[in-house]
């Protein structure tokens, strides 16, 4: 071959590769353009939705030959990820089906596959949106009403399954009920008897299902002025009202009605038989909830009426607003803007709907979807964007919450405190406190004065003491927190009479001179082993006076800030560990922190959190200390339960971490084994790169990890047993004493305490659930007082 010909061949090859890259680039540009057009269809523009759809259909029809799979994928993704535009996309699919029957069939198959996959992977919201989309395709003459009814009947069959959790049966019924607003009218006109039969089956199920969980999920224990309905009961009442109205609703936009003459000529597809996947123990279903109500039409000023509690429009509006929060919650400004741009805002009192939905999220039981601060920051942005109306509605909501706080769930009480203090801190702590001064006449444990006291404690964390004192009327003096300062007893006037004062003063000098931990240990040796009473401890395990002198002196020297305290603890970590060898010694450390910092709740919280992180104190020691006699006066204060929950969370995270590490190690081990066996079978060309010896954990390492996890599970179980046993003891003692004295046991203290018991169950439900059978066998037995036992039974019913 000549040099010239070789050169030509190289040029041709280069041109071929360049042309191929150009084609790929052009195809990518077209795909991106198609995706952009599909995603933006129906959004606000100068032209109508209908004309947008007509234009898009023409574009997609021309590109179906080349980009069919891409278009199928985008449309099915939109169906799941943009449920608020469901009817826009069903209309688009309907128009495409009218022009290209084959594509319509392919899309239905693709959507069915998405639905089945969502069910299989427990993506419950995605499955519900897929079902809704399939149902709305009946309105667009893409799917036959008969085949949809067969699918809905199959889903209701799940409600008759035996030996499966009720939450599974509930979800399938909920999915069907929440689909009916879209397709109910069409089914009513075409298949009325079949629809009535379906509704009858649903009614039979709803009448027989257990609602033991209901009281555990209520925000208020009272139904006045608004009933707190269980979610399926509420939706069923809304569907019945819709049926009475002949399935006519006023909220869902239906662009396909404009194209009815085109769509009705199209051939329809039948859904294949879809069998829901069988239940597996690994499946997790959505937990039940209570529908939150704060406002009714009497609360709203002149203007659009708030839809009634049992109108389907209320359900549709709330679901849409919840979805906006879910979509935009990561960016508070976008979220607030999207909420205020709600497409039907002129038909409803939007500000009231938004505030109610945000508080519904904040007070959602057992836990809110997102952090408390997420909702607080969104409300602040809403007030900035709508300063003329939103702050007034929010103030009205706050007033309603405060007036109803007497019967508020304890967990919701905490969230209300956290939100209100955060909100005040962003608005110069301005509030009309004089309007609430009637609470000053109530007992200190009553929820109203308790709320103000806790709010001021939280405001103190976000400001400083003088600012809090200045912002409050003088009548509230008894509710204002004391000045947060250390009470170092070895510097008091009577310190000379205290044992250990001399050593404490030596310790102060040594630490200020930047002594080493070993020098501190030597100074502490001057304290006799006999402790306070002059007698040796029965087990000789720890010296209370040594702990007293060391802990109070060190933390007083580090009292300037959190950072100073942390630095002191870290430097003398070894001394702490040496003194805290037993649980009793650890409880003694906690006692001294409380004695020093009893007026500074936040300092106690962060110090105990630090001691847990450094493994100076165990979780079980913290739990035992919280329920000790010493803490009786603090028992109804929020910070104490903040400490308990951070302790339990610390333990839970530790168990989850060990579990994850063990699973990963087992995966690596099994992959390494299979990789080595594959490498023996494969040819040299096909052989995969084996996992290296360094990556592969040994069986001994895996065994040690299993032992660690088992020990952590034992500690976790022990922690929960300690907590629940102490609750049972103090509550049983209170009930027995009240019965003996002939007093009403339903005191403020009792309601706080039973509420805290319920809070532990619900806040840590995933972890406690593992030990429910153990708890039932050892603690929550049938002979326990019914008031206490009911809390446990309601918790178990959440996933029953």
UniProtKB/Swiss-Prot annotation:
The superkingdom listed in its UniProt entry is: Eukaryota
Which SMART domains did the record assign?
A: MIF4G (SM00543)
What are the record keywords, sorted? Answer: mRNA capping, mRNA processing, mRNA splicing, Nucleus, Phosphoprotein, RNA-mediated gene silencing
Protein's GO biological process: 7-methylguanosine mRNA capping; mRNA export from nucleus; negative regulation of viral genome replication; nuclear-transcribed mRNA catabolic process, nonsense-mediated decay; primary miRNA processing; regulatory ncRNA-mediated post-transcriptional gene silencing; RNA splicing; siRNA processing
Which residues does the record list as Phosphothreonine (modified residue)? 9
One Gene Ontology cellular component term attached to this UniProt record is: presynaptic cytosol
Q: Care to name a GO molecular-function term for this sequence?
A: mRNA binding
Residue stretches making up the MIF4G domain: 31-243
Question: Which Pfam families does the record match to this protein?
Answer: MIF4G (PF02854), MIF4G_like (PF09088), MIF4G_like_2 (PF09090)
User: So which residues are the signal peptide here?
Assistant: none
Q: Where is this region: Disordered?
A: 1-26, 669-699
SUPFAM superfamilies recorded for this chain? Answer: ARM repeat (SSF48371)
Query: Which InterPro entries is this protein grouped with?
Result: ARM-type_fold (IPR016024), CBP80 (IPR027159), MIF4G-like_typ-1 (IPR015172), MIF4G-like_typ-2 (IPR015174), MIF4G-like_typ-3 (IPR003890)
Q: Where in the cell is it found?
A: Nucleus
Per the record, the similarity remark reads: Belongs to the NCBP1 family.
Relate the assembly described in the record. Component of the nuclear cap-binding complex (CBC), a heterodimer composed of Cbp80 and Cbp20 that interacts with m7GpppG-capped RNA.
What role does this protein play? Component of the cap-binding complex (CBC), which binds cotranscriptionally to the 5'-cap of pre-mRNAs and is involved in various processes such as pre-mRNA splicing and RNA-mediated gene silencing (RNAi). The CBC complex is involved in miRNA-mediated RNA interference via its interaction with Ars2 and is required for primary microRNAs (miRNAs) processing. Also involved in innate immunity via the short interfering RNAs (siRNAs) processing machinery by restricting the viral RNA production.
| Entry protein name | Nuclear cap-binding protein subunit 1
**Gene from which the chain derives:** Cbp80
């Amino acid at each position: 071959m000549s040099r010239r010909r070789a050169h030509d061949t190289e040029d041709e090859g280069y041109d071929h590769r360049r042309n191929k890259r150009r084609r790929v680039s052009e195809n990518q540009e077209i795909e991106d353009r198609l995706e952009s057009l599909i995603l933006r269809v129906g959004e606000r523009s100068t032209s109508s939705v209908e004309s947008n759809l007509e234009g898009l259909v023409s574009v997609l029809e021309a590109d179906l030959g080349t980009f069919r799979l891409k278009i199928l994928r985008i449309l099915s993704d939109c169906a799941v990820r943009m449920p608020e535009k469901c009817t826009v996309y069903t209309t688009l699919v309907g128009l495409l089906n009218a022009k290209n029957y084959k594509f319509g069939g392919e899309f239905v198959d693709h959507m069915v596959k998405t639905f089945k996959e969502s069910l299989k992977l427990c993506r419950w919201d995605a499955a519900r949106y897929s079902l809704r989309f399939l149902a709305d395709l009946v309105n667009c003459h893409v799917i036959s009403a008969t085949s949809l009814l067969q699918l809905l009947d199959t889903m209701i069959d799940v409600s008759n399954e035996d030996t499966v959790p009720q939450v599974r049966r509930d979800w399938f019924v909920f999915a069907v009920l929440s689909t009916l607003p879209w397709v109910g009218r069409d089914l009513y006109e075409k298949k009325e008897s079949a629809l009535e039969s379906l509704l009858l089956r649903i009614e039979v199920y709803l009448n027989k299902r257990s609602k033991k969980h209901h009281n555990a999920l209520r925000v208020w224990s009272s139904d006045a002025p608004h009933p707190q309905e269980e979610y399926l009961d509420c939706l069923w009442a809304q569907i019945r009202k819709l049926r009475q109205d002949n399935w006519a609703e006023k909220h869902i936009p239906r662009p396909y009605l404009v194209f009815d003459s085109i769509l009705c000529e199209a051939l329809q597809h039948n859904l294949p038989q879809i069998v829901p996947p069988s239940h597996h123990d690994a499946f997790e279903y959505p937990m039940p909830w209570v529908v939150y109500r704060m406002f009714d039409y009497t609360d709203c000023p002149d203007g659009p009426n708030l839809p009634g509690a049992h109108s389907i429009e209320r359900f549709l509006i709330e679901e849409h607003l919840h979805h906006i929060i879910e979509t935009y919650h990561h960016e508070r400004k976008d979220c607030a803007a999207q909420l205020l741009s709600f497409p039907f805002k002129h038909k409803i009192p939007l500000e009231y709907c938004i505030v109610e939905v945000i508080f519904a999220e904040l007070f959602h039981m057992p836990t809110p979807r997102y952090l408390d601060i997420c909702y607080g920051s969104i409300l602040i942005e809403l007030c900035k964007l709508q300063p003329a109306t939103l702050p007034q509605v929010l103030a009205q909501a706050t007033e309603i919450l405060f007036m109803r706080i007497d019967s508020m769930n304890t967990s919701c009480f905490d969230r209300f405190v956290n939100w209100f203090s955060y909100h005040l801190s962003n608005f110069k702590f301005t509030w009309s406190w004089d309007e609430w001064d009637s609470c000053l006449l109530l007992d200190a444990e009553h929820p109203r004065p308790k709320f103000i006291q806790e709010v001021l404690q939280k405001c103190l964390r976000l400001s400083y003491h003088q600012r809090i004192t200045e912002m409050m009327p003088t009548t509230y003096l008894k509710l204002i927190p004391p000045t947060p300062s250390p009470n170092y007893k070895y510097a008091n006037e009577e310190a000379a009479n205290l044992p250990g004062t001399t050593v404490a003063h030596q310790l102060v000098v040594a630490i200020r001179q930047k002594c080493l931990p070993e020098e501190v240990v030597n100074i502490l040796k001057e304290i006799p082993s006999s402790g306070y009473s002059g007698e040796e401890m029965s087990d000789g395990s720890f010296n209370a006076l040594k702990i007293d002198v060391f802990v109070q002196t060190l933390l007083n020297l580090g009292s300037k800030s959190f950072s100073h305290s942390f630095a002191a603890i870290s430097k003398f970590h070894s001394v702490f560990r040496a003194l805290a060898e037993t649980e009793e010694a650890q409880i003694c450390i906690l006692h001294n922190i409380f004695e020093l910092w009893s007026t500074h709740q936040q300092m106690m919280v962060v110090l105990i959190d630090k001691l847990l992180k450094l493994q100076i104190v165990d979780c079980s020691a913290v739990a035992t200390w919280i329920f000790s006699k010493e803490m009786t006066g603090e028992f109804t204060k929020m910070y104490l339960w903040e400490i308990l929950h951070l302790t339990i969370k610390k333990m839970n995270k530790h168990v989850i971490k060990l579990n994850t590490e063990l699973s990963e190690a087992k995966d690596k081990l099994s992959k390494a084994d299979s990789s080595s066996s594959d490498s023996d079978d494969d040819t040299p060309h096909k052989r995969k790169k084996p996992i290296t010896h360094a990556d592969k954990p040994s069986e001994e390492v895996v065994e040690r990890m299993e032992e660690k996890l088992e020990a952590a599970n034992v500690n976790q179980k022990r922690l929960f047993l300690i907590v629940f046993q102490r609750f049972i003891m103090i509550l049983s003692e209170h009930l027995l004493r009240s019965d003996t004295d002939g007093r009403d046991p339903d005191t403020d203290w009792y309601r706080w305490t039973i509420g805290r018991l319920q809070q532990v169950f619900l806040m840590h439900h995933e972890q406690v659930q593992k030990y429910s059978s153990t708890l039932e066998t050892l603690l929550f037995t049938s002979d326990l007082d019914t008031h206490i036992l009911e809390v446990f039974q309601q918790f178990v019913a959440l996933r029953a």
